[in-house]
Amino acid sequence: TAEETMAEVEKLAEQGLVATFPMKKDIYLMHASYRDKVADDMVAYLEDFHKKNPYRLGSRKAELRVRFLSKLKQNVFDEFMQRLEDTGRIKRSGEFICEGGYEIPHDEVYKQFESALTAMLDKAGFEFIRLADIQLPGIQPAMAEDLLQLLAAEGKVVLLSDDLITLPKYTDMVAEKAREILAAEGKISIAMIRDMIGT
């Protein structure tokens, strides 16, 4: 019967032989040794990922699902990841997952990129810069993209679209001036904003 089966499942769970994932309608089971192997493989993958991509926030959650648990339903996978995060073996940053102890290096490469990009964006003012326009010696395009995403996540730059970049102080100035015009005029247009910033 269903009751007898559940009693046996509970015994196995108490013994640590299976992991249970109770959802709204069903309970999903995973053998504990399989759960541990997947967790170990995932953490090893993330450690290798960080060596190859030191400035990325982590691997995308969807990529990990496809790579390690593609047959698992999304809600069960989410619960698996939450439990793994609760153990401290991984941590999340939005849609990105990294190894639990990983910290992105704020080393010389990071500092030089941040400094050079800030200078470029300051010089550009309200003439926003495109990612393709950023060419710094010794920085490969893929690494520049990673560093840019990192600076955006840290709030040091603003990504206005897929490829337009500026500093937060410029978006803040535009927002403040737009509020002033809106308060004075009762309306605002794109043309008014362009006139206001001189573009």
Task: Annotate each PLM feature.
Residues 1-199:
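C-terminal non-catalytic scaffold/interaction domains in large multidomain proteins
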